[in-house]
Structures are given as C-alpha cells and as structure tokens.
C-alpha cells in the first residue's frame, strides 16, 4: 500500500515543517507530539540544535490524572509556557507536526498563549 496512514502522516508533517521553516527562519519552534497515551511539547532552537524547554504528560510533577485528554494538554501547554519564561523565551512559532490543529493540540497551543508565550 503506497499511501498508508503512516506515509500520508509523514508527508503532511514534512509539508507543514517546510512551510514553517521558510516563513520563520531563525525563530524558536514549539514542537508538539501526540501519541495514543501522552502528549508532549518542546521548545527547540533549530539554529543551535538545542532543546530549551520541554513538558510532557509523562512527568509526575504535572499531576495529570488522565494522560491523554484535553485537560492534560492544557496542563502541558501551561507548563511549557512557564518553562519558556524561565529560559527567557517570549516568542516561538507553533509546529503542529502533521497533527490536526484541533482538540488536544489546539488546547495545548491555547494554554501556552494564555501562559504568556507568543505563538
């Protein structure tokens, strides 16, 4: 099967990331990964190749009860915004990575915005 779900997802992720790189060269990237059980976010400096801040539902200190729901995504978004402030970051661009900007991904982005991170 040439166009399996995985292949289509990888094509979509590359298409999204390439468009974002053209427009946002030199800016920090807020990358989101969503799995069946967890959701995570990283603040990445692509120029230096360094992760400045990260947050995930796998961390015990976030106190997430249900790891894969909208409420958990909101907590991860708030945590990444707080850690970005500690790292001295105020602005980044949002890399949804091939996931639809809906539900958990949207909740994470909204919580990061409410936390003071400009996306």
UniProtKB/Swiss-Prot annotation:
GO molecular function: 5S rRNA binding; structural constituent of ribosome
Gene Ontology CC terms, in alphabetical order: cytosolic large ribosomal subunit
GO biological process: translation
Annotated signal peptide: none
InterPro entries: Ribosomal_uL18_bac-type (IPR004389), Ribosomal_uL18_bac/euk (IPR005484)
Keywords: Ribonucleoprotein, Ribosomal protein, RNA-binding, rRNA-binding
Pfam families attached to this UniProt entry: Ribosomal_L18p
Origin: domain of life: Bacteria
Xref: SUPFAM superfamilies: Translational machinery components
NCBIfam families for the chain: L18_bact (TIGR00060)
Functional description taken from the UniProt entry: This is one of the proteins that bind and probably mediate the attachment of the 5S RNA into the large ribosomal subunit, where it forms part of the central protuberance.
Family affiliation: Belongs to the universal ribosomal protein uL18 family.
Subunit structure as annotated in this protein's UniProt entry: Part of the 50S ribosomal subunit; part of the 5S rRNA/L5/L18/L25 subcomplex. Contacts the 5S and 23S rRNAs.
PANTHER family in alphabetical order: 39S RIBOSOMAL PROTEIN L18, MITOCHONDRIAL, LARGE RIBOSOMAL SUBUNIT PROTEIN UL18M
Protein name in UniProt: Large ribosomal subunit protein uL18
């Amino acid at each position: 099967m040439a166009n399996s779900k995985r292949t289509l997802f990888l094509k979509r992720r590359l298409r999204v990331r390439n468009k974002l790189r053209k427009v946002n060269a030199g800016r920090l990237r807020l990358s989101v990964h969503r799995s069946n059980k967890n959701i995570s976010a990283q603040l990445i400096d692509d120029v230096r190749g360094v992760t400045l801040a990260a947050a995930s539902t796998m961390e015990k200190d976030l106190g997430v009860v249900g790891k894969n729901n909208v409420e958990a995504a909101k907590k991860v978004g708030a945590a990444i915004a707080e850690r970005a402030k500690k790292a001295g970051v105020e602005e980044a661009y949002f890399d949804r990575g091939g996931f639809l900007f809906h539900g958990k991904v949207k909740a994470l982005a909204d919580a990061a915005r409410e936390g003071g991170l400009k996306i």
